[in-house]
Amino acid sequence: TTSSQSVMKDMATALKTPSVWVVAIVIFTIYATYSASSYMQPYCETVLGMSAVAAGYVGILRKDAIRLLGAPISGFISEKMGGRCALLIGIFDILFIISLAILLVLPVGAQYTVVTVVILVATSFAIYGMRGMYYAIIDEIGTPKKIYGAVAGFAMFIGFLPDAFNSTLCGYWLDAYPGAQGYRNIFIYMLVLIIVNVILIGILLRYISKNKEQIRKNQQELKGEVAE
């Protein structure tokens, strides 16, 4: 049908647009890191030697309190920055990279437990902050309204692919490398993902800077359609 042909044409246009792929992989790296971060709570219990109750409190702090605060706070900061979500994601990337790099070189021991928990909270704030904004960059790059739906659908498809393999991959590391090393491999995996992410964010920021006028026109056109 004509409608199906139009959808396929829009999808083809989206797939031929380099910035769309960059956005999709940005979402992929953030979501994969978020998914892998679920192993931080068992790390506290298995490696740091926390009691199940104490590790549970860390999990509640990380997954509930930080989750509730991360997105609204990042949204507020982004608004104060003029809606520059990509730039703020880049800042969160740096926070995450520094925090996780410290965690990887920090010795395992009871005397470092408090520092480790602070680091886990910092990385959680960064990842939830990024998650709260990654769809906003679809608009920030000036996605034309004609292919907006196709771009959003493609970005979500690529972005959530980690659900297909993350648990298997992390589970393999924990089985093959019992104890601290298994979790260390997961943390290195997360670190690599966010390093890739910050590189891609740099590419997007350059793209946004070079195409300001066209992006502004596309955004105005999209807002006009929403207003109607």
Roles of regions detected by a PLM:
Residues 142-178:
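A late C-terminal transmembrane helix in Major Facilitator Superfamily
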Residues 24, 56-57, 90, 149, ...:
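Conserved glycine-rich helix-kink/hinge and helix-boundary motifs of the Major Facilitator Superfamily
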Residues 84-137:
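C-terminal transmembrane helical hairpin of 12-TM major facilitator-type secondary transporters
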Residues 1-23, 221-228:
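Juxtamembrane intracellular "pre-TM" segments in multi-pass secondary transporters
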Residues 103-104, 183-222, 226-228:
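Multi-pass alpha-helical transporter architecture, strongest
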Residues 17-75, 131, 136, 166-167:
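Extracytoplasmic gate region of multi-pass secondary transporters
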Residues 85, 169-194:
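A membrane-interface helix-boundary motif in multi-pass transporters
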Residues 70-83, 174-175:
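Helix-to-loop junctions at the C-terminal end of transmembrane segments
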